[in-house]
Amino acid sequence: MRRRLSLTAALVLLLSLLCACAAQHAQEMDENGYELYFLSDPNSAGGGDAIRAQEKRLVLDGAMETEDCVRALLEALLAGPDEPSLSSPIPEGTALKSLKVSGRRAQIDLSAQYARLTGIDLSLADYCITLTLTQLPNVNAVSITA
């Protein structure tokens, strides 16, 4: 009985710490702050993570259509990172050809430069785009073609 009570108390403590951390992170980002995901420099101190977020303030009006919000985030992502320790997984010159939001899925068609990506490079680029776009409340899936 004591062990079960101790385990329950530890679990409650862990969950409250996680909730506090999430609330603090949400509070730190202002209402126009979004995270754009890029490749991190493998030689930078700390190492370990292949992808890291860069906070970007974008003016996305609450009345904007989801498609316009997706377009704004994609354009910021295609422009590349501001931080020198980050690099874009998306080939230079890649452009957005078309965009459609259907339900909660964003369907993105990128230019031919993106189609040259293969293997892990393609996976990382897809992952950065997906992580960036699924921050929007009306997007929970992303389809990418080139």
Model region roles, listed by residue range:
Residues 3-9, 15, 19-146:
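Bimodal "functional hotspot" detector
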